[in-house]
């Protein structure tokens, strides 16, 4: 199988090997039939919805921290890590424009321009600079972020420099280079307390055990990006149709085994 689905050679394959022809054929066909019969049961391990709906659910929830996975731009899966779509949606909402709105941590977004200014002005200063959309600007352009610098940390192996900028009720973690935030210490090192925060948005997919155990609730947002998980939304260029789930009512494919000669014979 392959996740690089936009190619005529990509499809799901059941491969069985052995030295008994009848057993190999029957095993392959039986397993393929099981995959096909259960195709509609394959789901994410957490609920999924749009980024807009994710924010609405998080704002209304009394469980904290309500963690949202911004998974379409997950750098650990191959995303650029600097797509601004989700953060832009957050900053546009009136709920987060006031200091006493729902507390939110956004982790994280690269912004070398803002980092440079924050290092010069220091903690407690007002800073304004561009963040994000350096590598991937297909869905949203750079954000001109302004706010108060509440933390600066240098020397991180991945981010190099981390700066927290507070704007309204949102704490935005800005980095020199992209970094996934997997551990509580990633936040507390920046004087942020994720356990006592209403909403935490992370650019990862499935939650690592530490964040999973911390969550009050969790949803995976089908956000745009280089690793967009909304399969039906992707603009396929090279694909053999019909293919499930793009064609949900397609007829059963040919599940007969095809024999391949042993390579050294």
For the regions a protein language model found, what residue spans apply to each?
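Short, solvent-exposed amphipathic alpha-helical segments in soluble enzyme
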Residues: 29-33, 82-95, 122-123, 188-193, ...
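Short, glycine-/Ser/Thr-/acidic-enriched flexible segments
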Residues: 19-21, 72-75, 111-112, 170, ...
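C-terminal catalytic subdomain
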Residues: 74-166
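Short, conserved charged micro-motifs
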Residues: 21-28
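Metallocofactor- and cofactor-centric catalytic cores in central/energy metabolism, strongly enriched
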Residues: 11-13, 18-20, 32-66, 76
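Extended hydrophobic packing segments that form well-structured cores
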Residues: 14, 36-39, 157-265
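Generic beta-sheet signal
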Residues: 64-70, 200
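Single conserved hydrophobic/aromatic residue that forms the stacking wall/gate
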Residues: 1-5, 9
């Amino acid at each position: 199988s392959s996740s690089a689905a936009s190619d005529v050679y990509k499809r799901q394959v059941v491969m069985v090997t052995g030295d008994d022809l009848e057993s190999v054929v029957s095993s392959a066909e039986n397993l393929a039939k099981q995959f096909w019969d259960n195709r509609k049961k394959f789901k994410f391990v957490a609920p999924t919805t749009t980024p807009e709906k994710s924010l609405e659910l998080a704002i209304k929830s009394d469980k904290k921290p309500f963690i949202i996975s911004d998974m379409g731009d997950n750098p650990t899966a191959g995303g650029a890590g600097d797509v601004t779509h989700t953060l832009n949606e957050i900053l546009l909402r009136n709920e987060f424009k006031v200091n006493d709105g729902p507390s939110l941590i956004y982790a994280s977004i690269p912004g070398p321009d803002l980092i440079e200014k924050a290092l010069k002005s220091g903690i407690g200063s007002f800073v304004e600079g561009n963040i994000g959309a350096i590598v991937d600007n297909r869905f949203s352009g750079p954000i001109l972020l302004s706010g108060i610098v509440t933390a600066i940390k240098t020397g991180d192996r991945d981010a190099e420099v981390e700066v927290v900028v507070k704007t309204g009720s949102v704490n935005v973690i800005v980095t020199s280079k992209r970094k996934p935030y997997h551990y509580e210490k990633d936040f507390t090192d920046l004087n942020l307390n994720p356990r006592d925060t209403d909403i935490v948005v992370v650019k990862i997919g499935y939650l690592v055990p530490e964040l999973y155990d911390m969550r009050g609730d969790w949803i995976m947002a089908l956000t745009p990006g280089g690793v967009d998980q909304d399969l039906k939304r992707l603009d396929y260029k090279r694909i053999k149709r019909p293919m499930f789930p793009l064609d949900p009512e397609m007829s059963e494919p040919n599940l007969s085994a095809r024999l391949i000669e042993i390579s050294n014979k």
